[in-house]
Amino acid sequence: MSDVQALRIDRLSSADPSQVARWEAFVMACPAATFFHRAGWQTVLREVFGHATYFLYAHQNGEIQGVLPLGEIRSRLFGHSLTSLPFAVYGGVAASNDEARDALEAHAQQLARTLGAEHLELRHTEQRHPDWPAQDLYVTFRKEIAPKEEDNLLAIPRKQRAMVRKGIKLGLTSAIDATVDRFFALYADNVHRHGTPAFPKRYFQALRDTFGADCEVLTVSSAEGQPLSSVLSFYFRDEVLPYYAGDDEAARDLAANDFKYWELMRRACARGLKVFDYGRSKVGTGPYAFKKNWGFEPKPLHYEFCLYQREAIPQNNPNNAKYRLLIQAWKRMPLPMANWLGPFIVRNLG
């Protein structure tokens, strides 16, 4: 009689340390997994935003063979969705074999129907379902970090390298912050100038509390000590991912933005990290051009959808023409009011 058990799908309980430890061990070892597959996102989504989470894992004979973190968003403004993963650039299934991968996706589709979701979205880095509707708006930028600091500097194209050297010449400095205070002030002001709502400060504090040393804030200051530019980054295995950033209006003239990313790369090199993940950008935008100018090549992201109660993929992004008037109005709103109102909107964008 065989002792082989059937593959099972279960839901992660964040209250069970042994389950969390097994999940985390699998994610750290699975080549297909990313920082956004980590178990801590379940806590962040629930405690900061109040969203229901379904962190599914496939296991057999006591071994996890795949994970699929899902978050459910119910919004009168933006609809009802089940996504892997809200507020993340990557997601979908991370599995060690096709059986686990297929079983998790099938379970997610059934779960979405049971919940009455309008759509299921899986944010894949590789195409999984050519026959599913897909969002082709986003690309990611990743590049290897050379072992030597000077080689990384020389790998930056001439124009942007000159900006880095300008920042150095102007006496800009960088420091790792113990709090999110300076970062949030720069971030909130920055997104307000662009006409988009800001996440609440407690979200960034929750990221720091949840992920510890794997979530770090680096802030660049002028020679006189004025904070100019800041970035909150994630560390995963041998990679660094600058994820949220903010700049003072004076940062551009002082080359603080280029200097900031150089300092992050330089420090990552010193730590022996291998990959600089510049993150997601929309095709044709300023951030897209900025990363290209740094010598990074875009790679398409495959955000694939199952549509249940809608006919087309939702376009809840600033490129949507129907949001242009709202963006202009948001820019004119006083910053304290925008910081108060923003979290009520952004929690549902995902």
Model-derived regions: residue spans:
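Non-catalytic accessory segments adjacent to catalytic cores
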Residues: E99-T140
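Short intrinsically disordered coil segments
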Residues: L85, L154-M163, N317-R324
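Acyl/amide activation-and-transfer machinery of modular secondary-metabolite enzymes
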Residues: S84-G92, D136-K143
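A conserved beta-strand-loop-helix scaffold within acyl/acetyltransferase catalytic domains
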Residues: A6-N61, L68-F78, H124-D253
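Active-site/acyl-donor-binding loops of N-acyltransferases
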Residues: S2-A6, E72, E126-D151, L273-K274, ...
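Aromatic (often tryptophan-rich) hydrophobic motifs at membrane interfaces
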Residues: L56-L68, S75-L77, A88, S96-L111, ...
